């Protein structure tokens, strides 16, 4: 998939999940997408096909992420964390459709892969796209650490 990267955010203290996480990722996610791992410490448990981008663990999350994202050259990022264990194949056709929606709707900056948040706010369906809902940036919990395309 052109111009798309997989950004995996993790921390070394969670390395006990990596074997399961990367094993399931290899089974269920396209190998045609470049993989970046944002982490505070490199380790041999991180597969060699991933580009490791180190951050300073003494910084706040926002600063950690900001210091790493500049290493990603692709136009689109699929964001996940190491605790997002895949149990089925990722529908790359949906991701391609979502990229097209982002291309056509410049007022959208990201699409979450989970409808949710802390409360159901009765959000409207976004411009006739099935299963997409508009989320105002004025609502609480506008930013959440969820799997997303941006």
Region locations from a protein language model:
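Well-ordered, non-membrane alpha-helical segments in soluble/globular domains
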Residues: 18-23, 62-63, 91-100
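Short beta-strand-to-loop acidic/aromatic patch adjacent to the donor-nucleotide binding site
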Residues: 75-87
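N-terminal anchoring/stem segment of glycosyltransferases
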Residues: 1-57, 67-76
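Histidine-centered beta-alpha loop that forms part of the nucleotide-sugar donor binding/catalytic region
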Residues: 11, 81-82, 115-116
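A structural signal for short, well-ordered beta-strand segments and their strand-loop junctions
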Residues: 36-37, 77-79, 109-114, 149
């Amino acid at each position: 998939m052109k111009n798309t990267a997989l950004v995996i955010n993790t921390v070394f203290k969670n390395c006990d999940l990596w074997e399961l996480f990367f094993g399931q990722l290899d089974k269920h996610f396209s190998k045609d997408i470049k993989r970046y791992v944002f982490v505070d410490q490199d380790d041999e448990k991180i597969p060699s096909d991933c580009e490791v981008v180190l951050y300073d663990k003494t910084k706040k999350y926002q600063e950690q992420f900001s210091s790493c994202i500049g290493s990603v050259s692709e136009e689109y990022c699929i964001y996940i964390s190491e605790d997002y264990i895949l149990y089925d194949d990722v529908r790359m056709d949906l991701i391609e459709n979502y990229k097209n929606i982002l291309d056509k709707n410049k007022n959208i900056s990201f699409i979450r892969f989970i409808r949710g948040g802390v409360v159901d706010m009765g959000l409207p369906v976004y411009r006739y796209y099935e299963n997409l809902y508009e989320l105002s940036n004025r609502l609480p919990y506008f930013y959440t650490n969820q799997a997303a395309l941006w």
